[in-house]
């Protein structure tokens, strides 16, 4: 940095590169400006949450509440991106169930082990995801985020570079799973229902 003479983290370069790639991809993928703006806002918030939770083990409320607001707002704007749910009732139910699912996990783990399994930031993030995709997305996104976390963390547990009591930010895995669900959720449900 020219101002403070400190080294700028390489993470900033990657974040800006990822945003640029997303921006171009979304521009080519979307058919109208409402979709373009909405999806870009969502992905920018996802990236900010991803890196903040990864580094600081916290998801600021302002980011979660911004996502929840966008998840509810999308029901009223003239866009019909088929990968989102467009029923306000389903958005609200999805948000409530997303929040309560994580809250119950936190509550039960606290009762059984007297430890915090996750933070309420993860619960609010699942509420936001529920507002975008509705109730049916919650089990699949939680399943995929748990499997993704396990696959990424398991090698460090086997190598003993991390122990079972180490903090693991769960938000990034929820976000990865939400993006996966955005593209493949309906296809997976079609396979499961066959």
Describe these PLM feature segments.
Residues 9, 13, 32-36, 61, ...:
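Hydrophobic, aromatic-rich alpha-helical transmembrane segments
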Residues 119-121, 155-180:
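Interfacial loop-to-transmembrane junctions
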Residues 1-33, 190-194:
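N-terminal transmembrane signal-anchor/hairpin module of polytopic inner-membrane proteins
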Residues 1-12, 104-118, 155-164:
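Cytosolic, membrane-interface loops and tails of multi-pass inner-membrane proteins
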Residues 22, 26, 30, 73-74, ...:
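Alpha-helical membrane-inserting segments
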Residues 136-166:
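Conserved post-catalytic alpha-helical subdomain immediately downstream of the catalytic base
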Residues 41, 48-148, 191-194:
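Functional transmembrane core segments of multi-pass inner-membrane proteins
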